[in-house]
Every structure is written in structure tokens, then in C-alpha cells.
């Protein structure tokens, strides 16, 4: 298929990056080397793919959902030994055979699957721990990136921002206007890099799961004070003990609690519940 004859499908949320400066910027911040095994999610017509394959990398494995693009991509990169292509939905496709080989994940994420993508790929930096990702580079909706970067006390702080910051160091590179895409979306995007927290600083798996539990309970009623959310799992006596041992005021709302305080709350809650 000729790429000029292909028309985007709205159901896939396709907004292809056409800004050459941003394409070059992604390649630059990836800091590619001959040992890199790249996973590219949703290569589209292959503009970014071509940039990455032009670098000294070991392998690029692309996952594409749109069946009409499979032939186009195969025709375009069939003669490149560094390229492999898998047809499937990134939210459900089996990557077990290559997951431990992947060093960097790069994607222009469709807005409609941003949340699930973050859960899968940033989540792997934590509980799953069966990956060697050095860096995850996502081009994604600006307001989601702004939420992820929110600190305690911000109205945008939430379970998403706390979980992402627990598992990775996050750096926003730049904002990207709608005109950089074809067709242009209605909102701005941001280019962001996630790097896994140093192994020595990673949380114990059971502790990480308990933090998730506390976040889920607390942010389900984010306008309520901690005392009025955690009472679903703690008695008044236990809450008083937890507040004192963690040095956290239970009159605070969840968005006002720092990451270190969430860690303390989870650590001490586990002790109390033993």
C-alpha cells in the first residue's frame, strides 16, 4: 500500500507526528546505542521508525494495531534486519519473549489509551520487575503530563501522579502544538521521559501494593479527610496510632499528602494490621 493512499481511522485515535524537529528531538533524548532494543508502540506510517532505525541500535520491535498499516510498514522496512513488526493491541499483546530484552520504549500515544498504557509500562518499573527498561519516552496529552508532575497540595495531585513519581523519575522535555500532527488534535501534547528509580531505592513489592490500596481508598473520595476515608479499613484506635507513628495529620485530604508520607502511612499500616 502507498502511504499516500492510506487514510487515518478515527477509532484508533491516529494523530501522526509530522514535525521533523520533534522527531529529531525524540531521537536525541533517546540517546541510542548499539545495545538498544527499542519497543515502538503504534509506528503509524513509520516516520519515527525510520529515524530510530537510522541510528546505531540492535533492534526495533514495533507493535501496530491497524491491519492496513502492517503491509505498508513491512514494505517500507522489510529489508532492514533491525526491524520486526507485530500485529496486535499493545494493551493485550504478549511481549513475554522480548520483554527482558527491551531497553527503551518509545511511543506517540493515542489519547484514548493513555491511562492503560501508563498502567502497563510505568507499572512494570515496579511490581512486575521483569524488565530492563532504561528509559520510556512518551508523546502524550499535555494535561495528563501536567497531572503526573503535580506535587502535594496541587488540586491536580492524585493517585496517578503519586504512583508515577513513586516508580520513576519524570522529566517533561517540551510541549508540542497540535500543528505538529496530522490530523491536528484539539489539544496540546507534551514530550516526557520516564526513567526507573534506582534499584536500591525501589519499594518492597508488598509495600508498593499497600500504597496502591491506600491511594485507591483515599482518592475515591478525594474531597474527604483521611480520617473519613481510611475508616473503611481502620478502627478509630488504629487511625490514631497510625497518625501518630507516621506523623501525618488525618484532617488532611489525600492530595495534600507527600509521597514520603504515603510510604510512611503504608509501612506503619502494615505493622498495625499484623
Curated annotation (Swiss-Prot):
Entry's EC annotation: 2.1.1.182
Matches recorded under SUPFAM superfamilies = S-adenosyl-L-methionine-dependent methyltransferases
Q: Does the keyword S-adenosyl-L-methionine apply?
A: yes
State where S-adenosyl-L-methionine binds. Answer: 15, 17, 42, 64, 89, 108
Cellular component, GO annotation = cytosol
The alphabetized UniProt keywords are: Cytoplasm, Methyltransferase, RNA-binding, rRNA processing, S-adenosyl-L-methionine, Transferase
Reaction catalysed by this enzyme: adenosine(1518)/adenosine(1519) in 16S rRNA + 4 S-adenosyl-L-methionine = N(6)-dimethyladenosine(1518)/N(6)-dimethyladenosine(1519) in 16S rRNA + 4 S-adenosyl-L-homocysteine + 4 H(+)
Report the GO molecular function annotations. 16S rRNA (adenine(1518)-N(6)/adenine(1519)-N(6))-dimethyltransferase activity; RNA binding
Provide the function of this protein: Specifically dimethylates two adjacent adenosines (A1518 and A1519) in the loop of a conserved hairpin near the 3'-end of 16S rRNA in the 30S particle. May play a critical role in biogenesis of 30S subunits.
State the similarity comment. Belongs to the class I-like SAM-binding methyltransferase superfamily. rRNA adenine N(6)-methyltransferase family. RsmA subfamily.
Query: Which NCBIfam families does the record associate with it?
Result: ksgA
Protein name (database record):
Ribosomal RNA small subunit methyltransferase A
In its UniProt entry, the species of origin is given as Prochlorococcus marinus (strain MIT 9215)
Q: What is the lineage of its organism?
A: Bacteria, Bacillati, Cyanobacteriota, Cyanophyceae, Synechococcales
Designated gene of the protein = rsmA
